[in-house]
Design a protein with these regions (language model features):
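Conserved substrate/cofactor phosphate-moiety recognition/catalytic segment
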Residues: 14-71
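Hydrophobic anchor at the beta1->P-loop junction of P-loop NTPases
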Residues: 8
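Conserved phosphate-donor/acceptor-positioning beta-strand/loop module used by diverse small-molecule
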Residues: 95-115, 147
Length: 167
């Protein structure tokens, strides 16, 4: 079976990790989060462009290794810049993995309340980071599906399963 490379992308706090975990469980895939990679690679994050490049380079390296061993991979990150998304396209092409891109979206008031309620999460993103990213997020031009995570977990799960063809 051909491995999949599924990039779950979107603004901070929209619920990417929730959706990515669901996909990883259903696909028996390795879940790779930029938040976790950053924690592994950087002791005191400053979120500079150089640091972002380092984190995404390591993310793609880990994905390449997993795909090389025959595993599917779910990537969880903002992928704020088109260049990072293009690297996912290139990786899929180089490894022969089937690429999917899922944009997770959520209404702003819901995001802000979820960010305020976060505890014990690898993400450092706060409400100001969310608002800043919202202003500077490159539009997604790649073919993609969208999941609206503004509602209940059951509604989000149903959308994810519909994308995978599961009911």
């Amino acid at each position: 079976m051909t491995p999949r490379l599924l990039a779950v992308i979107g603004l901070p706090g929209v619920g990417k990790t929730t959706v990515a975990r669901e996909f990883a469980d259903r696909l028996d895939a390795r879940l790779l989060r930029t938040d976790t990679v950053r924690t592994d690679c950087v002791s005191d994050p400053d979120y500079t462009p150089a640091e972002r490049r380092r984190v995404y380079t390591e993310l793609f390296s880990r994905a390449r290794d997993a795909i090389g061993s025959g595993r599917s991979v779910v990537l969880d990150g903002t992928f704020r810049n088109r260049a990072d998304r293009e690297r996912a396209v290139e990786l899929a092409g180089e490894t022969g993995a089937t690429l999917g891109v899922v944009v997770v979206d959520c209404e702003a008031p819901v995001v802000e309340s979820r960010i305020a309620a976060r505890e014990n999460d690898a993400s450092d993103a706060d409400i100001e980071v969310y608002r800043d990213f919202r202003k500077r997020y490159d539009s997604v031009r790649l073919p993609h599906a969208t999941i609206d995570n503004s509602g209940t977990m059951a509604a989000t799960r149903a959308q994810a399963m519909a994308l995978l063809g599961d009911d």
